[in-house]
């Protein structure tokens, strides 16, 4: 008999789009629980009732090694939901607002993974999208403290 693979946590996020919410299938979650040893489930889906969203890996760039969560705040990356996740998962949040120009209008970038990714030794970041100097400096400082080369 095989031993189940240990998975520390299963994260259920709050999603803006109704059709994406339907993809959250509890029958699959139950199968996962049988095949993997899941220590806990972090369920943030209840935020949907309050129109508060945190859309998972699009919203958050996780530096798992250093337990830091980088997030560009937007309608799809809410600070309250983000702080709830960080408190439960024991991550330190680094937040900022990131902007892009679309059809002549300046809009928030709604997913952090549009402007940032992180690896063991480096981070690719479009720093120009962070207009607030203090927020940009906090992000740079965090990456430098964790010895990430900024590309």
Protein language model annotation of sequence segments:
Residues 1-151:
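The feature marks the mature, well-folded catalytic cores of soluble enzymes
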